Amino acid sequence: MANIGDGISAKMAEKFFASRGHGVLSLADDNDGHGVPISYGYDLETGRCIMQFVLDTASQKQQFLEASDTVTLTTYEYDADDTWQSAIATGSLVSLSSEDVANWAAAIFFTNAANVETAVRQEASETVIEWYELEIESLTGRENLGDERTKTKFELDQ
């Protein structure tokens, strides 16, 4: 039987989540689900999670963004079947004003997100940039470190 791993402390889950900077955002519209690979910036000090969406007319993201009351953002690191970590943040997305982006949100995003240069490079004239904060209601994590368990860098910091 496969090992489903062990739950990790809230502090470890938060540190792992902050270290990743990318994951899959799950949105829903009635019974239709939509997963979006996305970069995010999470600030450990403030607990703020910022995302930048690059939308175009052919994208379904806007429809799902508007319809989703609750979303999940999943990030993970997989080394082998018995060596992995994951974290799931659940909450709601709040659209950010241009003032919020200029004053603090862009700094969080560009300091902590992974692969942000891709989003900036692919910006075209027919795209629209929207910024959101994921207001996290719960953040949980699991890990499996194999048979030869050693402390993770997140445990060592505790």
Regions found by a protein language model. Give the residues of each.
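Short Pro/Gly-enriched beta-strand edge/turn motifs at strand-loop
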Residues: 7, 19-24, 114-116
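A generic structural signal for nonpolar/aromatic side chains embedded in well-ordered alpha-helices
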Residues: 17, 64-65, 108-109
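Non-catalytic surface loops within mature trypsin-like serine protease
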Residues: 44, 57, 77, 95-97, ...
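Short beta-strand segments
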Residues: 20-57, 73-74
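Helix-adjacent hinge/juxtasegments
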Residues: 53, 57-87
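Extreme N-terminal tail/first-helix region
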Residues: 1-19, 152-153
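Amphipathic alpha-helical interface surfaces
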Residues: 13, 58-61, 101-106
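Charged, gly/pro-rich active-site loop segments
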Residues: 2, 82-158
